[in-house]
A protein has these predicted regions:
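Active-site cores that bind ATP or allylic diphosphates and position pyrophosphate for catalysis
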Residues: 1-427
Length: 427
């Protein structure tokens, strides 16, 4: 009997990734099917469906699921789910498909068929529907109304841009996943399926496991958060996004090197498990924090570390909106349908000169002038511009790796600071 938190949905991990003879047979069949091209973001979602990371999803959402998730944070059957997971297709492709047809999902970037799909429904994503999804998914406390949101969203919000650039139709239906792309080889030893992370945790005898979401290299604030989590748990799961980020962010292979050297030199190694997952960032702030908790439950994590501006971008969200949303979502009475992974909420963290170390608003009594807010955005800006980085911003071993990466860039990366990066607490 496992001591781990059960997968989301109450039915165990929903695995749609084929193996062995079944895989080879489906690959042959896929060669004769109509091919639907998918985006890198859809590829990441597809792999998560395949491995059980998105349990209980077994395919891409119907219109009823899409609408219910947008409106109520619930699938049509009443299971909690925070963000639409959909597959787009051009009008030309959609017109050539009938409901009940099987299609092959083709990844142009990797030049391979990733999955087969039985199309149970196709529905139009009008401009109105796309805007509706964006307002429900991406609009936070940083803007007061839809009019204000749309004044800046299409220019400044990468998640909004992705949705608005999607093709005209969505295809829904169950999938049979044939490949995990190059993630298992490109991130060997880091990329983990939920079944693999669960086995690691079980072998260690862990049950209270907070997950730490990373899309930036670990600076001192990240280190502090992880160590706080370790103090109140069996160990921490440092789970890095190895899919695509927005332009100017630091690539996954560099971030993984930084985590490796930090864990080796500054952590008790058997209290840390490092993993990677294949999604692209959505930058959906509070809703994405809920998604992070949902799929971390599938990976075996009991808690999700939520700090300031989790999964945010620019000034679209309140600093701690990603924490308070956990108190506002529906919790279905049927336990398996409710989100069980709980937030580990952590206050503002910073380096304090008077404390001579990392601290938070709960532990440091000193003035704002004594504090240095540490953020990935500020770190990237300093590295890009070649300006000095104070020792308290990051460990030397980590900064050396980052400097080497930035020195090798041929084009200068412009990094824009925003409220969450500078410590502006007005939100």
């Amino acid at each position: 009997m496992s001591n781990l938190i059960p997968p989301h949905g109450g039915k165990g991990l929903t695995i749609c990734l084929l193996e062995g003879a079944e895989l080879e047979e489906e690959k042959k069949k896929a060669q004769g099917l109509k091919q639907i091209p998918i985006t890198p973001s859809e590829r990441g979602d597809l792999i998560m469906i395949g491995t059980g990371g998105f349990s209980p999803l077994s395919g891409f959402m119907t219109k009823a699921d899409w609408k219910s998730v947008c409106d109520n944070y619930l699938l049509a059957d009443g299971t909690f789910w925070p963000i639409p997971v959909t597959l787009s297709a051009s009008k030309e492709d959609a017109d050539s498909i009938s409901e009940g047809d099987e299609v092959a999902l083709y990844d142009p970037e990797g030049d391979e068929i990733m999955a087969t799909m039985k199309v149970t429904e196709k529905y139009e994503m009008t401009e109105e529907n796309k805007r509706y999804q964006c307002e429900k998914t991406f609009m936070g406390e940083g803007t007061t109304n839809a009019e204000e949101f749309w004044k800046i969203a299409e220019d400044e919000h990468p998640g909004v841009q992705k949705v608005m650039n999607q093709k005209q139709f969505n295809l829904a239906g169950p999938v049979k996943v044939l490949s995990e792309s190059d993630f298992p080889t490109a991130y060997k030893g880091i990329y983990l399926r939920p079944s693999e992370s669960r086995k690691i945790f079980e072998d260690k005898g862990w049950s209270r496991i907070p997950a730490m979401q990373l899309r930036n290299p670990m600076h001192r604030s990240h280190e502090y958060l992880a160590k706080i989590a370790i103090e109140v748990s069996d160990g921490v799961f440092i789970h890095s996004l190895v899919g695509n980020l927005k332009p100017g962010d630091i690539p996954a292979d560099v971030r993984v090197k930084c985590i490796d050297v930090l864990v080796k030199n500054y952590f008790v190694e058997d209290k840390v498990v490092q993993g990677g997952y294949p999604l692209d960032m959505r930058y959906a702030g509070p809703r994405e924090a809920l998604l992070h908790a949902t799929f971390r439950q599938n990976y075996g994590c009991s808690h999700m570390i939520i700090g300031r501006d989790h999964a945010g971008v620019g000034d679209f969200y309140g600093m701690f909106e990603a924490q308070t949303i956990f108190d506002k979502i529906p919790y279905p009475e049927e336990t398996g349908k409710a989100l069980l992974c709980k937030p580990l909420k952590i206050d503002w963290t910073f380096y304090c000169h008077k404390c001579d170390g990392m601290a938070s608003l709960k532990t440091c009594p000193h003035a704002k002038e004594d504090r240095v807010i540490l953020s990935g955005t500020m770190l990237r800006k300093s590295l890009s511009e070649g300006t000095p980085i104070p020792d308290h911003f990051g460990r030397k071993e980590v900064l050396d790796i980052l400097r080497e990466y930035y020195e090798g860039l041929t084009d200068k990366v412009e990094v824009k600071l925003h409220g969450a990066a500078t410590g502006d607490e007005k939100k």
